[in-house]
């Protein structure tokens, strides 16, 4: 079945259609209907514009290409499974939640509270402007993500990020089993209370990073403006260049070309030791 060049505004306009192509349609109009594609299966959606709320709910097996979801298209994808979005624009708040097996490729996203409670989310070559993204999501792979947002990746588990630029704050709090390769992470208070965070060839920018962490590993990373780093953390870090200051690390080893100040004061945890090495040239 093919639905082409239609303007639809009814409630559940194409409810539960299966094995269909939806091409060049606009979901907008005075009826202001919600949930246009709810419960659809095996659909291909191409070149459509979504201006109404909740279009993709409980959808299974969809390919969505060159579509626009405007600012008024709130909560666009919830409770979905196995959807691939390519060259799409997502502009409404809470655009992705409680979904599984989602792929986003070359998408532009402006959405607060994006990507909550998702499982197996893959993003490649995407731009994301957001606040509070990826809360409690797991099993994610992100490559070439350009992100601007606050409070990102909190409580996430089993995440791999590559070649990305993350401009954020309070990122990776309470995260578990996250690895980041070849990326820039900018923002204060990075990864407090994280567990098994590994940063490889990354540049870290911002005050008071990586505190209260367990199993923290940094390999061949750079640190810029990172004062009061590693407080109460179990850390194994090899830093290229200097660290502005290190305060009361709990255990492990920190190796750098220079450290502006090492603060070991009366608040240091007793009966613990972290080896701090300044490499000579």
Residue ranges and their predicted role:
Residues 1-281:
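Long, distal/terminal scaffolding or interaction modules
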């Amino acid at each position: 079945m093919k639905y082409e060049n239609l303007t639809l505004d009814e409630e559940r306009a194409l409810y539960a259609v299966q094995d269909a192509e939806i091409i060049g349609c606009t979901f907008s109009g005075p009826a202001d209907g919600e949930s246009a594609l709810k419960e659809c299966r095996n659909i291909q959606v191409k070149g459509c514009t979504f201006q109404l709320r909740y279009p993709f709910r409980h959808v299974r097996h969809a390919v969505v290409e060159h579509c626009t979801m405007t600012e008024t298209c709130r909560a666009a994808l919830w409770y979905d499974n196995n959807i691939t979005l390519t060259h799409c624009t997502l502009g409404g708040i809470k655009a992705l939640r409680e979904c599984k097996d989602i792929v986003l490729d070359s998408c532009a996203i402006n959405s607060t509270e994006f990507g909550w409670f998702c499982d197996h989310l893959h993003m490649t070559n995407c731009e994301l402007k957001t606040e509070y993204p990826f809360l409690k999501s797991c099993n994610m792979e992100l490559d070439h993500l350009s992100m601007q947002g606050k409070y990102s990746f909190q409580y996430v588990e089993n995440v791999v990020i590559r070649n990305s630029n993350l401009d954020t704050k309070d990122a990776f709090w309470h995260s578990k089993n996250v690895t980041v390769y070849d990326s820039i992470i900018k923002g204060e208070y990075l990864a407090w209370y994280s567990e098994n965070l590994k940063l490889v060839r990354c540049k870290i920018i911002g005050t008071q990073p990586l505190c209260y962490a367990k199993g923290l590993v940094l390999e061949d990373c750079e640190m810029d403006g990172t004062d009061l780093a590693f407080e109460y953390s179990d850390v194994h870090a090899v830093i290229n260049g200097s660290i502005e200051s290190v305060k009361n690390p709990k255990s492990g080893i920190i190796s750098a070309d220079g450290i502006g100040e090492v603060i070991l004061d009366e608040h240091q945890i007793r009966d613990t030791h972290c080896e701090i090495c300044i490499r000579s040239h």
